[in-house]
Swiss-Prot record:
GO CC, one annotated term: membrane
Organism: Homo sapiens (Human)
Polar residues: compositionally biased ranges: 306-315
Subcellular location per the Swiss-Prot or TrEMBL entry: Recycling endosome; Membrane
Protein name: Late secretory pathway protein AVL9 homolog
uDENN domain: residues covered: 17-161
Entry function: Functions in cell migration.
Span of the signal peptide: none
Positions carrying Phosphoserine: 244
UniProt-annotated stretches for the region Disordered: 299-336, 349-372
Transmembrane keyword on record: yes
GO biological process: cell migration
Membrane topology qualifier: Single-pass membrane protein
Gene transcribed to yield this protein: AVL9
Amino acid sequence: MEKARRGGDGVPRGPVLHIVVVGFHHKKGCQVEFSYPPLIPGDGHDSHTLPEEWKYLPFLALPDGAHNYQEDTVFFHLPPRNGNGATVFGISCYRQIEAKALKVRQADITRETVQKSVCVLSKLPLYGLLQAKLQLITHAYFEEKDFSQISILKELYEHMNSSLGGASLEGSQVYLGLSPRDLVLHFRHKVLILFKLILLEKKVLFYISPVNKLVGALMTVLSLFPGMIEHGLSDCSQYRPRKSMSEDGGLQESNPCADDFVSASTADVSHTNLGTIRKVMAGNHGEDAAMKTEEPLFQVEDSSKGQEPNDTNQYLKPPSRPSPDSSESDWETLDPSVLEDPNLKEREQLGSDQTNLFPKDSVPSESLPITVQPQANTGQVVLIPGLISGLEEDQYGMPLAIFTKGYLCLPYMALQQHHLLSDVTVRGFVAGATNILFRQQKHLSDAIVEVEEALIQIHDPELRKLLNPTTADLRFADYLVRHVTENRDDVFLDGTGWEGGDEWIRAQFAVYIHALLAATLQLDNEKILSDYGTTFVTAWKNTHNYRVWNSNKHPALAEINPNHPFQGQYSVSDMKLRFSHSVQNSERGKKIGNVMVTTSRNVVQTGKAVGQSVGGAFSSAKTAMSSWLSTFTTSTSQSLTEPPDEKP
């Protein structure tokens, strides 16, 4: 069966690339102890050698603080080997067992407990499905009490590759283990703030321990974006690392010259002499210079051979050398002026006619899209086939190209990856961490999400204002919370029903993002956009994912209502929502809330004390009254002539 699942070149053909066992050595730390097939072709199954791109694998598979838990699960992402291909999705189950319980105790086991992790490296993001299978196998592997018995791991590899395929992404099983219901119950209306925060491509750090809660919350947020889990993460772990800024000196010479870009005049287009487009591929993973390859992306029959190129052609300037001050210069490939050019609509018509000439598979996701900037007042026609996201999109342009061009998604970050947070080649990230050192470095992120407390710490006051939900947004969030909380006790729902269930919540966010995108295409749309937040939409239009989406046409959006799903007149209930939101999120509101809780507690305690005091006084008064009445009835005549003596 192994031959059946592997091609003639020895490359695995199934979705599962490797089964790996990672252990903790008392001297060497975390290390790979077994891999099937071997991580390095030609090495043995017990080789400790790692590919350079996967050097952090042991620290991801056996995360920080693993010794504090008997067992747990972690999701992580690895970059592709040699810069080719897509993200590798890792799912790891780790356990620990007492050393004295082992049937075969190896010489290097010197501690009382043994920690090991079994992980699957897959080409498909089937987190929950692989986790369910892996937990069973890991339990059986530990029950053997002899870690040299690896036959069960080989069987796991063969079984997964024979039972899983690309069709696994089409059903709901891709969302197995990712529960938006639990997310809404925990974060309530703040879920929409998280959604918008990622739309803006900000640096977002999730923090909680244990790691299973961390990766579950982070990936569940991403599952709210249509198509993101299935097709939007193929480029989420790729970036262009650079050892030091001093190496940038060599990059200036390797920048593509002006001749590497295409410009066409009106006359050129009329003669259909488009020729061959040259594309520039950026070097990946330590390559200091850009590689230039010439490939015919589209060919048109040449009817004007022998003509010399026009010397008056304007050329697109090459991207500037990256620097800490402008780390996004290499990633942004569309000039903002394109969005504002009044003649763009006419130019787009020509560009859209050429779009179907670009085979989707012919342009790698890491290549720079082919674009030609508009030349104002030159009479030239601009060829804009559309920015290429490299993702498999639907008719609405989903998933959005958020996790592309250096914007990373790292469900779990090991401490050894800390440098990525400050790397100038990383545009941003959505990352998870369990180590408190990440949380303390607040200057390296735009927002820290405290999952345990359902708290979102946004450091920049301007960003807080920008993400402040509108009245329509608050209605939308309240609508979600009410439907989820009303059905939370339904034993038959369990997240699988429709209204208030997981699929229903994802459908609501799909309606929201579709309406938002449709609203941005409307003319005179200021009033419509105000329901989404005018400043938010303005900031979003400057992001890479929106520019890529807006540079291509999506006719299906013409059928979408651009109005906010919860637009309407302001009412008293809106005032209550706004007050509730302010109390829960503003610093002053939190203080007021804490004071109210403290005051309420003190009132209750004081009431009990007063009750006890009043009760005692009433009993004493009752006794005194009874005694007085008794005295009054027995000596009436005496009490009428002279008052009884009263003791002080």
